[in-house]
C-alpha cells in the first residue's frame, strides 16, 4: 500500500531531525514550531495560491527550519513577482527553492540554471543525502553503526 503524503513527509521530517541531532556537535540546526491549519488556509486565501499537499504537511510539522549551519533552509512561503513561490534556500550561495504557483512543481534556481524535483519529498531526500555525506565525513565509513547505536535502527 502506498504511503500518504502525511506519512512520507513525517518520515522525512523525523529522519532529518534525527540526522541534524546526530550532527549537532558540528552543525547547528533549528526546527521551529509548526504552523496551524488555520495559518495555512489563511495564507492560501490571501495569496490565492494552493500550497502543494506535501508542503502543507511539512508546515504542520515546522513553519521554518535551518539545517547544517543554515546551509539548508525551508521557510514559510514568500510570493514573488514571477510564477513561483519562494520556500527555501540551499547552500547559502544564491540557490533558492521554489514551487510553481500554477503546477505546484518544486525546483531550485542557481545562476540561471533550474533543477526540478519530482516532489517535495524528493527535495527532502536530497537534503538527507547531504546530511548523510556529512556524517560519513565526521564519523567515517561506519557512521551508520554509530547512528544506529545512538538512535536505533530505522
Question: What are these model-derived regions, one by one?
Answer:
Residues 1-103, 152-154:
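A surface-exposed partner-binding patch
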Residues 36, 62, 82, 108-109, ...:
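Residue-identity detector for threonine
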Residues 69-71, 124-126, 134, 142-143:
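Short, charged/polar low-complexity linear motifs in solvent-exposed/disordered segments
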Residues 95-97, 107-108, 116-118:
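Short helix/loop capping segments that flank catalytic or ligand/cofactor-binding pockets
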Residues 102-112:
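Intrinsically disordered, low-complexity regulatory segments enriched in Ser/Thr/Pro
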Residues 111-137:
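Compact, glycine/acidic-enriched structural inserts
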Residues 131-154:
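Acidic, proline/glycine-rich low-complexity IDRs
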